[in-house]
């Protein structure tokens, strides 16, 4: 209940209450403790101080001779937090919120408001009328989050103290005055409701501060303080310091949820409702305590809950079972504050004069259901726990040293029963271990029961580092199977002990145990299996000692027989008794083995080595925790001794005095800023005004994207398309016409400026069309948002845009997304950083649910995004191509990426000065200082030493050469480079030196000290010292800004650098601070990365590698030794990447030439999406893609980018141009390359004016020993950084797992981490949707500084281009073949009437030859007067064995009136394309329609599928079941907007791609649209077009061509016309008044245009709707006299041509208005596959019918490569081999009954294809002979473009061409009917040797036709001239006979 205070209970009343409480708990049905003690009042009387007044139930077991008691003074239980001071929170470090359960969904969480959203602040409630129930009072509560406000609460008076601080009932009862909710019985519940957001456990004493009263004006105001205790009589401990942060007595650790500053979530114990407590959990750890001992507890083994913070005396018994599998260490230190407050995880030492017990008792027990403690209480300590023998192996004895045996405590739900404590299991930690011996021992948990620890617990650290390695028996069968093991391969305890010894023995003196390394040892041992008989418990001691003997004394074995506590106690006692001289002989590790009589061995490891114990303890702290610890040490002055040490130089002189002396000596003179030696001084005023010449030659300002970036961008685009095509309907690309974006970056000002600069340089805002050219530069910053406190406002605005623009595809790019992945529920202010913001933004419901929003997370260390709970699908990951595989073919001059792997491999180069270095001299200094200052964190010591090293190096190089020998050579070399290089150049360019100092306080200290030393030494104009803090802008002195401006030729005096790249060439030291590097790019002048502060605190892969990632860059290929490149070439064939093919394509191009920007439209035609290098789509104007200056006056960008830098479009720095010794030529340009080889730098590289380019060398990284060991090659025997835990926010999902395979690509690594890691509780993905990742989220991963920003900006660009392409369509753009010029003079002018005159049209001559370009390779039709181009002969021939010729297309933008395919979706026409649920398919009705076809000579049955909504277009029988007819309007109907003609669309194979959605084309008007489909395709069309009427052809037409569909449409339409005439005639309508027209339209008609005369004499073309076109034609006067009306085909040349006649008589196709009445006797050839329209038009014309084309209208046809009436795949009927064999055209026919391979294709199709390609063999005399065409009776067949056909109809009274005087070269009789007679044929003249070809259905018909037509009289036949199509008999082949004219 947590409401106790300074008053004390009488012991008798307390015991009675305790008894009642336990009894109530035991009797209750639930396992939770019941709220009791409300009958007790606290009495503040001074306690008597006698131990006898405390009556513990176990005192009898502890009572012995009083002389053996050790009396210890205990401090007051009233900790600092109980003081009345309002500001009683810790001032040295920001508090962590007291972690409660998450608030209910949808509730208000704003400070000052209750969860119902009502304002509780006193300033708002002061004048409100508040109803206060009887017995309640208004009080004011203070919230740590808003200290300036008081919250108004109503509390029951009974639970408030009186004026004396007495008589307050324990517990709580309160009401919310905001929303009126009543009955809060627990203060925890109430504090949650009013959003107190506490940093400690909720206590009414701490947070209810004031009574509230009304003033004279009646306003509510603050009254008197609530007197919770009698402050006058309460003594305070002298050792209690208010400046101390919360104690470290926590079981929290990184492995138990306490990472990155997240303290474990303690179970609610105070004022908490029982329902919130975990039954059977460790919440009972704060049960009744007796004499300072905590009872043993059993912790549940599930390991998913974080452990609570433990009180003073700790039993770690349950710890071994309660930790998570890979639990990290537990840090124990003396608790000086409330045990439930947040631990700082620092090292707390006992103050002078404190006894061990006083340290242990300073806090007292938790204040709930416990006996009160008093500062004067004397507590006895059992004598049996004190005398411990020295460290030595214990020999076998008759029994345990202590008579009491181990007892496992019984845990009672919620309340732990008081039990006697076994004295033998108690370990007293000696005093002052850390102070006296410089060691804080670390206890590595093994197996077994650990003892109670009592005394100076702050000097012992309990770590579960290796405990997961011993949990092999907990593996399930599935995990064992994945490891290739079975249960019988698990190791015994004895084997694990021996393996532990072997591992510890081989560790170096500067190595610490690594869990991942030891886990692999254990796994290998299991896989290898036992090599001999198992080790018995009796053999274990001597085998263990033998194993330890090889360690040289670093490992010792201690064997006990009672308990592990004996061995631990003995080891600690021995340590405390060791003299300082003997400390060097202490072992580093003591393995304690307990061999009990039961035969079960227990063991643990005590780490006593000074380095090892310290490194292990520090590695347990998360980054936030150790930064907080450093802050504490700096604030409290613990570093004063260390600081005083460094006030002197290494020679013993006072450093400050020495610097002052040097300053006075030089007076006002300073070292010359540049172009001068360090010994050359000038006056300071002159130095301040020295401006260098303009920098080295400027590079061109072109912006380029390089092949790897383009490859990645395309991969991202492909993945987006895959999401859209996945069928999950999570992304519909067809609805978007724009792209917008927002980039989220970590809270770094420099990173924001850097990203904004990339956006400006890339021109992406202009390319996306979201900003004007004039405003794009100024508005770029709107698209980049820092994840800080202002992100919510900007995200709200962004999400409003997302909701308001549903047809814009938004992309939310989360750059460097691995930096903060803390859950918003556990996010907190830690070390000044607000965490959880990314989770609130990226994972908020609005973002997850927005269907027009893509989330792209970008990371160079994506491991934490790839756990089992990842929100990103593995398919949605895009990984950077492997750089090694792209380097084999590149030129030595090219720049190649040099990354983390390359740094590790560089150690094999064998060079004298490696680029990856460890400063051994510095490490030796650090080791000495660490031993002198054991209380301080090692980073503090390293930082102070580093500052001194740089200071002394500056002094040694200028004024004190004697200090040279005291500075490490590495430091001296870096500083010498920094100082000397500017002096060698007239420009003053120099190096950048990057020093990484994670702690902000230490970084500021370093900046101050180095600036002070620099200025006093006169170097303030030589180099700059900058603090690189994420929270601040770059601050640079004025004279350095002037130097940068001079280099850039920048005239803007207000310009200052905003990014680190802007510091290009500036000699400077950048002290980079902050918890993590945030992705900032550094200039190529960065030469050194000093990472010597990155040590054993960075033991996760991400933490370590992101630090070394600062050094990664692009380097010149030739500077890399051949070992690297040779390896690359060897590995290249083995591992192929998707972009490897781009290398050879450009190998021969010159390396020094710039590639011109490519034309965007050309790129669109080739790649369909993007330009290659000229990334800006503005390059379609053939302009360079360089960005222009909006002011028109700058050379570079307005940011004054460096003249010698690469123009960068990505997150990579321009590679360092500085080599180890080559910067003496500072004016030379950096290496650049415009080669398009596959491996390109991520920067845009431009060719400099000079050709002698400086080589770009890798940067030098100087590491600590710990980091160097992990990054060195594994040949050194150490694990690599890749084997570490990938990130602190995830944990291993299994104690054992296979090792991380070497050389894994990004995808394989992702799969590994997804299988073997799981998110921790505070991770944003902790409750992620494992089975269903977010469908619209992608991950882009790539190495640091490789160019990811440029890649995703290019992705945005090509995504937009693709969306535009989706709104564009490729239409055929072909000019008509030459028309008959002689007729053009006779046509009316273009300004003629809108509609044709029937008589005028009759006067026009029908143009027999088809002019559409799709008939380019068809036979020309002979006419009386041939066009000029056709009077000659066509020479082209279509080779059917080759691919069909590509027709010209052009991309046009879809208009509002376009027809669409099934992928189109919009709100207006969704009923056209969106599939309906299966349950609604029954809404469609099936109807059979039967009629008799005179052409077929039999009845035909068609099937209609009619949706319910379309039934109004049909007439059904009275019963409603029989379809009678389709309704037709009347010719006289004048209703506006009415469409009279039903539209038939024959379609096949295009259920998705056919343009069957004509809703927009018809302007949404009512119309009748019928799809004519084959029977086997009906289900597919029904699925995609459920609301369309389907006309299903009979099954006999499944293999027929389009001619059959057109034939059936016309036959059905005429039969329906007759039915409608009969039906309407009964209603009094004349038969001739029924509308006789139908529309027959192809499924590829997309747009319609109308031509109008333009002002300049040219015609203007505008888009119109299909509705307007049809209505115009339907309104034609005397329309019933026209047989067919149609449109012309569009081409781009129409607008430029001179106006022609408005109407023509010619061939019509694609879209026709057909009069089925007039054309009753003119049929489509149902057998035809091709040219059926030409054949029909010739028949209709020969019948004397009118065909009229409206030339003012044109139709655009989309190029659809899929489906349609395309060629069949001709293949052999029986395939003997799998590989398809191409069949040549001559094999389409064969001799009857031959053995030739028969083909699986329709006979008619084979015939048409044969005639098309082989007619030159059939009719050799007609070849290229237009004067002697081939005579074709009643049919038009395509005989190829070289053979001309003369069409003649055999029908009586037909209109035929005048053939008088024409001698024909051949005769073609195709399925001729009875109208063809011998007398007709005798009218025609043929050349001698002319060819006859007679084609019939079968052989008998063929012979009968020969006889009937008397062909043998004039034609000679041979038996071998008979052929058939190459079909088998069941496929009904066609037969034909050829003959020669006699």
Curated annotation (Swiss-Prot):
Q: Which family does it belong to?
A: Belongs to the GREB1 family.
BP GO terms, sorted: kidney development; morphogenesis of an epithelium; pronephros development
Output the Gene Ontology cellular-component terms.
membrane
Encoding gene, per UniProt annotation: greb1l
Chief location of this protein within or outside the cell? membrane
Task: Kindly name one Pfam family recorded for this protein.
Answer: GREB1_N
Sequence ranges of Basic and acidic residues compositional bias? 1127-1155
| Record protein name field | GREB1-like protein
What residues form the membrane-spanning segments?
1861-1881
- List all Acidic residues biased stretches: 81-90
What task does this protein carry out?
A: Plays a major role in early metanephros development.
Entry keyword set: Developmental protein, Membrane, Transmembrane, Transmembrane helix
Q: What is the lineage of its organism?
A: Eukaryota, Metazoa, Chordata, Craniata, Vertebrata
Which residues does the annotated region (Disordered) include? 76-101, 235-306, 325-373, 1123-1256
Localization (cell): Membrane
Biased composition, class Polar residues, residue ranges? 338-362, 1172-1202
Gene deletion effect = Morpholino knockdown of the protein causes abnormal morphology of the proximal kidney.
Positions with biased composition (Low complexity):
237-253, 1158-1171, 1212-1248
Where is the secretion signal located?
none
Q: What membrane topology term does the record carry?
A: Single-pass membrane protein
What the entry lists under InterPro entries is as follows:
GREB1, GREB1-like_2nd, GREB1-like_C, GREB1-like_cpSF2, GREB1_N, TAGT
């Amino acid at each position: 209940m947590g409401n106790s205070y300074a008053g004390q209970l009488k012991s008798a009343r307390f015991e009675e209450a305790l008894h009642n409480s336990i009894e109530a708990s035991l009797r209750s049905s639930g396992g939770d403790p019941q709220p009791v003690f409300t009958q007790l009042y606290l009495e503040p009387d001074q306690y008597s101080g006698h131990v006898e007044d405390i009556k513990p139930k176990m005192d009898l077991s502890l009572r012995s001779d009083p002389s053996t008691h050790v009396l210890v003074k205990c401090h007051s239980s009233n900790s600092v937090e109980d003081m009345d001071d309002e500001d009683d929170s810790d001032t040295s470090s920001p508090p962590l919120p007291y972690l409660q359960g998450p608030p209910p969904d949808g509730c208000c969480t704003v400070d000052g408001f209750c969860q119902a959203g009502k304002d509780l602040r006193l300033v708002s409630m002061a004048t409100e009328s508040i109803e206060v129930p009887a017995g309640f009072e208004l009080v004011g509560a203070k919230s740590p989050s808003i200290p300036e406000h008081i919250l108004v609460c109503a509390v029951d008076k009974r639970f408030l103290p009186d004026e004396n601080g007495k008589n307050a009932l324990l517990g709580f009862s309160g009401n919310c005055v905001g929303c009126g909710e009543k009955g809060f019985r627990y203060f925890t519940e109430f504090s949650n409701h009013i959003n107190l957001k506490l940093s400690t456990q909720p206590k009414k004493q701490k947070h209810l501060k004031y009574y509230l009263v009304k003033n004279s004006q009646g306003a509510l105001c603050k009254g008197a303080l609530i007197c919770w205790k009698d402050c006058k009589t309460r003594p305070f401990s002298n050792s209690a310091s208010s400046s101390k942060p919360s104690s470290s007595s926590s079981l929290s650790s990184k492995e138990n949820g306490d990472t990155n500053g997240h303290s474990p979530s303690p179970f609610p114990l105070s004022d908490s409702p029982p329902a919130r407590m975990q039954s059977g959990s460790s919440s009972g750890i704060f049960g009744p305590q007796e004499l300072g001992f905590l009872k043993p507890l059993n912790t549940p083994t599930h390991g998913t809950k974080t452990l609570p913070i433990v009180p003073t005396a700790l039993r770690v018994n349950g710890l071994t079972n309660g930790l998570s599998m890979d639990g990290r260490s537990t840090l124990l230190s003396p608790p000086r504050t409330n045990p439930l407050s947040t631990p700082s995880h620092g090292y707390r030492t006992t103050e002078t004069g404190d006894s061990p017990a006083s340290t242990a008792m300073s806090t007292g027990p938790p204040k709930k259901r416990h006996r009160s403690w008093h500062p004067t209480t004397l507590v006895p300590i059992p004598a049996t726990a004190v005398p411990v023998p020295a460290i030595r192996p214990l020999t076998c004895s008759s029994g345990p040293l202590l008579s009491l045996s181990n007892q496992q405590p019984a845990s009672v739900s919620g309340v732990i029963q008081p039990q006697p404590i076994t004295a033998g299991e108690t370990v007293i930690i000696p005093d002052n271990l850390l102070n006296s011996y410089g060691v804080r021992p670390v206890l590595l948990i093994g197996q077994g029961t650990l003892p109670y620890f009592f005394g100076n617990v702050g000097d012992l650290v309990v770590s579960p580092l290796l405990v997961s390695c011993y949990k092999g028996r907990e593996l399930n069968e599935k995990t064992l199977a994945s490891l290739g093991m079975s249960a019988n391969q698990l190791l015994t305890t004895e084997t694990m002990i021996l393996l532990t010894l072997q591992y510890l023995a081989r560790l170096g003196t500067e190595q610490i145990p690594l869990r991942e390394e030891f886990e692999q040892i254990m796994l290998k041992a299991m896989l290898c299996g036992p090599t001999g008989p198992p080790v018995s418990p009796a053999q274990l001691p001597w085998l263990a000692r033998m194993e330890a003997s090889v360690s040289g004394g670093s490992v010792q074995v201690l064997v006990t027989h009672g308990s592990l506590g004996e061995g631990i106690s003995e080891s600690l006692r021995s340590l405390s008794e060791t003299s300082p001289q003997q400390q060097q002989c202490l072992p580093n590790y003591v393995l304690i083995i307990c061999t009990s009589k039961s035969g079960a061995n227990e063991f643990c490891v005590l780490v006593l080595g000074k380095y090892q114990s310290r490194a292990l303890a520090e590695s347990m702290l998360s980054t936030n925790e150790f930064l907080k610890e450093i802050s504490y040490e700096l604030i409290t002055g613990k570093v004063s001794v260390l600081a005083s040490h460094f006030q002197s130089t290494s020679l013993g002189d006072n450093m400050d005095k020495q610097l002052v002396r040097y300053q006075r000596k030089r007076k006002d003179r300073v070292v010359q800023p540049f172009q001068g030696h360090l010994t050359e001084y000038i006056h300071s005023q002159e130095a301040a005004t020295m401006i260098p010449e303009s920098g080295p030659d400027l590079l061109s300002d072109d912006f380029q994207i390089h092949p790897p970036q383009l490859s990645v961008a395309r991969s991202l685009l492909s993945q987006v398309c895959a999401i859209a095509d996945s069928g999950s309907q999570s992304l519909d690309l067809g609805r978007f016409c724009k792209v917008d974006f927002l980039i989220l970056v970590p809270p770094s000002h420099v990173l924001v400026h850097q990203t904004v600069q990339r956006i400006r340089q890339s021109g992406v805002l202009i390319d996306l069309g979201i900003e004007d050219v004039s405003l794009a530069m100024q508005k770029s910053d709107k698209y980049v948002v820092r994840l800080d406190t202002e992100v919510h406002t900007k995200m709200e605005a962004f999400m409003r845009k997302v909701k308001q623009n549903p047809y814009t595809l938004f992309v939310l790019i989360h750059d460097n997304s691995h930096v903060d992945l803390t859950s918003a529920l556990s996010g907190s202010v830690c070390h000044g950083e607000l965490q959880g913001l990314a989770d609130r933004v990226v994972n908020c419901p609005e973002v997850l649910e927005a269907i027009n929003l893509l989330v792209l997370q970008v990371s160079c260390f994506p491991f934490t995004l790839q756990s089992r709970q990842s929100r990103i699908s593995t398919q949605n990951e895009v990984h950077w191509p492997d750089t090694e595989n792209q380097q084999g073919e590149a030129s030595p001059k090219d720049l190649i990426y040099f990354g983390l792997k390359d740094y590790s491999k560089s150690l094999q180069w064998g060079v004298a000065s490696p680029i990856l270095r460890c400063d051994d001299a510095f490490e030796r200094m650090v080791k000495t200082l660490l031993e002198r200052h054991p209380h301080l964190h090692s980073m503090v010591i390293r930082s102070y030493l580093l500052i001194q090293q740089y200071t002394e190096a500056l002094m040694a190089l200028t004024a004190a050469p004697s200090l040279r020998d005291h500075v490490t050579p590495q430091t001296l070399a870096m500083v010498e480079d920094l100082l000397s290089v500017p002096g060698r150049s007239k420009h003053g360019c120099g190096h950048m030196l990057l020093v990484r100092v994670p702690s902000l306080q230490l970084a500021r200290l370093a900046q101050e000290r180095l600036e002070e030393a620099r200025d006093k030494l006169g170097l303030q104009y030589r180099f700059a010292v900058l603090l690189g803090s994420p929270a601040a802008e770059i601050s640079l002195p004025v004279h350095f800004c002037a130097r940068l401006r001079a280099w850039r030729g920048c005239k803007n005096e207000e310009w200052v650098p905003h990014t680190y790249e802007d510091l290009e060439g500036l000699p400077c030291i950048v002290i980079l601070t902050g918890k993590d590097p945030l992705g900032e790019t550094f200039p190529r002048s960065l030469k050194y990365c000093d990472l010597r502060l990155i040590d054993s605190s960075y033991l996760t892969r991400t933490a370590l590698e992101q630090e070394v990632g600062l050094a990664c860059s692009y380097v010149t290929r030739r500077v890399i030794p051949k070992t690297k490149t040779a390896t690359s070439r060897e590995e290249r064939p083995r591992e192929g990447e998707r972009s490897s093919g781009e290398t050879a394509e450009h190998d021969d191009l010159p390396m020094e030439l710039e590639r011109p920007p490519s034309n965007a439209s050309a790129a669109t035609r080739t790649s369909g999406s993007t330009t290659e290098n000229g990334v800006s789509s503005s390059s379609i104007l053939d302009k360079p893609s360089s960005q222009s200056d909006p002011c028109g006056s700058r050379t570079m960008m307005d940011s004054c980018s460096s003249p010698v830098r690469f123009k960068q479009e990505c997150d990579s720095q321009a590679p360092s141009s500085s080599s180890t010794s080559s910067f003496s030529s500072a004016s030379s340009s950096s290496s650049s390359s415009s080669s398009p080889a596959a491996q390109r730098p991520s920067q845009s590289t431009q060719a400099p004016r000079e050709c002698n380019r400086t080589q770009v060398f890798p940067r030098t990284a100087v590491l600590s020993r710990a980091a160097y060991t992990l990054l060195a090659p594994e040949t050194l025997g150490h694990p690599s950084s890749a084997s570490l835990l990938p990130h602190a926010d995830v944990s291993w999902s299994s104690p054992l797992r296979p090792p991380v395979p070497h050389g894994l690509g990004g995808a394989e690594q992702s799969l590994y981490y997804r299988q073997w890691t799981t998110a921790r509780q505070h991770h944003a993905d902790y409750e992620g949707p494992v089975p269903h990742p977010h469908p619209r989220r992608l991950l882009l991963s790539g190495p640091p500084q490789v160019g990811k920003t440029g890649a995703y900006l290019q992705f945005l660009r090509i995504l937009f281009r693709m969306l535009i392409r989706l709104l564009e369509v490729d239409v055929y753009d072909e000019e008509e073949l030459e028309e008959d010029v002689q007729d053009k003079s006779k046509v009316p002018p273009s300004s003629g009437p809108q509609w044709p005159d029937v008589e005028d049209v009759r006067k026009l001559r029908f143009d027999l030859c088809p002019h559409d370009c799709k008939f380019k390779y068809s036979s020309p039709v002979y006419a009386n007067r041939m066009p000029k181009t056709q009077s000659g002969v066509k020479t082209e021939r279509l080779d059917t064995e080759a691919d069909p010729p590509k027709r010209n297309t052009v991309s046009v933008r879809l208009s509002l009136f376009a027809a669409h395919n099934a992928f189109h979706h919009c709100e207006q026409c969704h009923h056209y394309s969106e599939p309906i649920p299966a349950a609604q398919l029954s809404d469609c009705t099936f109807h059979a329609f039967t009629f008799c076809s005179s052409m077929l000579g039999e009845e035909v049955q068609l099937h209609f599928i009619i949706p319910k909504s379309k039934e109004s277009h049909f007439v059904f029988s009275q019963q409603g079941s029989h379809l009678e007819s389709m309704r037709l309007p009347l010719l006289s109907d004048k209703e506006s907007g009415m469409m009279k003609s039903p539209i038939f669309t024959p379609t096949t194979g295009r259920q998705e791609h056919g343009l069957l959605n004509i809703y927009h084309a018809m302007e949404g008007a009512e119309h009748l649209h019928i799809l004519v489909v084959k029977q086997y395709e009906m289900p597919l069309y029904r699925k995609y077009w459920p609301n369309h009427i389907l006309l299903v052809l009979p099954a006999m037409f499944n293999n027929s061509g389009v001619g059959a569909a057109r034939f059936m449409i016309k036959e059905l339409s005429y039969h329906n016309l007759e039915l409608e005439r009969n039906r309407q005639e009964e209603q009094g309508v004349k038969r001739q008044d029924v509308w006789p027209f139908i529309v027959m339209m192809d499924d590829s008609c997309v747009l319609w245009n109308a031509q109008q005369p333009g002002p300049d004499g040219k015609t203007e073309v505008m888009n119109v709707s299909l509705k307007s076109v049809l209505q115009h034609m339907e309104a034609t006067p005397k329309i019933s006299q026209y047989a067919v009306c149609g449109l012309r085909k569009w081409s781009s040349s129409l607008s430029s041509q001179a106006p022609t006649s408005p109407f023509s008589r010619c061939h019509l196709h694609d879209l026709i208005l057909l009069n089925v009445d007039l054309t009753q006797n003119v049929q489509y050839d149902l057998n035809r596959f091709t040219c059926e329209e030409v054949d029909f038009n010739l028949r209709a014309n020969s019948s004397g019918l009118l065909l009229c084309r409206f030339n003012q209208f044109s139709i655009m046809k989309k190029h659809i490569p899929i489906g349609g009436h395309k060629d069949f795949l001709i293949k052999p009927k029986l395939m003997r081999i799998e590989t398809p064999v191409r069949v040549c055209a001559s094999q389409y026919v064969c001799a009857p009954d031959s053995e030739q391979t028969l083909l699986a294709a329709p006979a008619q199709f084979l015939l048409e294809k044969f005639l098309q390609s082989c007619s030159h063999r059939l009719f050799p005399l007609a070849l290229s002979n237009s004067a002697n065409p081939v005579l074709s009776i009643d049919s038009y067949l395509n005989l190829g473009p070289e053979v001309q056909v003369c069409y003649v109809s055999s029908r009586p009274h037909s209109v035929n061409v005048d053939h008088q005087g024409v001698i024909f070269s051949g005769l073609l009789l195709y399925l001729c009917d009875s109208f063809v007679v011998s007398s007709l044929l005798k009218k025609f003249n043929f050349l001698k040797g002319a060819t006859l070809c007679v084609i019939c259905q079968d052989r008998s018909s063929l012979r009968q036709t020969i006889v009937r037509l008397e062909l043998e009289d004039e034609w000679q036949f041979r038996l071998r001239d008979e052929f058939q199509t190459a079909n088998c008999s069941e496929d009904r082949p066609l037969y034909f006979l050829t003959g020669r004219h006699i």
